[in-house]
């Protein structure tokens, strides 16, 4: 598996396995174990997904040394604020059954964000978290929060695919040496994306499927991707992208597909109200 280097010199696998919306108590365990067997070594979960325990069990039962697996999790809004965040980090570690987490993110940009960030910084300095990062942060939100941060985020996980290329955000993140990480890299099954003429023609040329062309393009853009699937053949296919390379002209053709229309706007007050109301524990 190819890797990228983060701004703290830690390496991260270029393609990770996402477990968003896969249920706990069995399905996430099975999917994670299958992904590890397929060759993934980067698993992306979150407190808000309510499946950290299944991820932890699968990693333990895989027989693969913990040092070879990169675990990402995220703090949910309910546990923002300095003291709550410290407890939330410990809860994630307990559910995952680990004594450190490779990458821990603030999942959404609301509430007592900087209080939670301070707790992440302290956990990072203590070695409980190897890298810390942000998620769903726009340029405006970055400008709002950045001056309250002592440790620079290693990653910003956002919606990213050929239709949502985040060009302004990528420029600002690059200026701060923050690596972009893609959720919905395949557009959450968007037929318009997967059946796009440019992508389909490249798939035919390289004897790949549309998803593999997209994931290869994301890799060549220097962005980490987190495809999700419970289908074992598709899992394998999503990391079978390192035996070909898109040309400069093909990269430009993919870049021309940008619509700049994300599925939701993190700056929308209605989005903030909805997410702040979601509770994951008593």
Question: Could you tell me what each predicted segment is?
Answer:
Residues 23-36, 81-96, 115, 140-142, ...:
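Short, acidic/polar
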Residues 40, 98-101, 129, 153:
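A structural motif
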Residues 22-26, 44-54, 78-83, 109-114, ...:
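Acidic-and-aromatic substrate-binding clefts and catalytic sites of carbohydrate-active enzymes
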């Amino acid at each position: 598996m190819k890797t990228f280097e983060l701004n703290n010199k830690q390496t991260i696998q270029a393609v990770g396995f996402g477990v968003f919306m896969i249920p706990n108590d069995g399905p996430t365990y099975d999917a994670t174990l299958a992904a590890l067997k397929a060759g993934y070594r980067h698993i992306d979960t979150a407190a808000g997904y309510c499946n950290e325990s299944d991820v932890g069990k699968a990693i333990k039962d895989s027989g693969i040394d913990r040092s070879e697996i990169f675990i990402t999790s995220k703090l949910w809004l309910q546990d923002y604020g300095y003291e709550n965040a410290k407890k939330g980090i410990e809860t994630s570690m307990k559910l995952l059954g680990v004594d450190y987490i490779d990458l821990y993110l603030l999942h959404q940009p609301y509430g007592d964000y900087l209080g939670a960030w301070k707790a992440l910084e302290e956990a990072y300095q203590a070695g409980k978290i190897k890298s810390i990062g942000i998620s769903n942060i726009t340029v405006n939100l970055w400008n709002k929060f950045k001056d309250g941060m002592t440790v620079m985020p290693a990653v910003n996980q956002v919606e990213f695919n050929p239709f949502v290329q985040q060009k302004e955000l990528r420029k600002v993140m690059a200026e701060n040496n923050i690596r972009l990480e893609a959720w919905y890299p395949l557009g959450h099954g968007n037929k318009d994306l997967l059946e796009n003429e440019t992508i389909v023609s490249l798939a035919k040329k390289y004897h790949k499927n549309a998803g593999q062309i997209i994931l290869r393009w994301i890799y060549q853009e220097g962005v980490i991707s987190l495809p999700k699937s419970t289908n074992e053949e598709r899992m394998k296919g999503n990391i079978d992208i390192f035996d070909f390379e898109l040309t400069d002209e093909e990269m430009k053709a993919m870049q021309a597909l940008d619509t700049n229309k994300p599925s939701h706007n993190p700056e929308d007050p209605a989005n903030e109200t909805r997410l702040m109301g979601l509770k994951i524990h008593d």
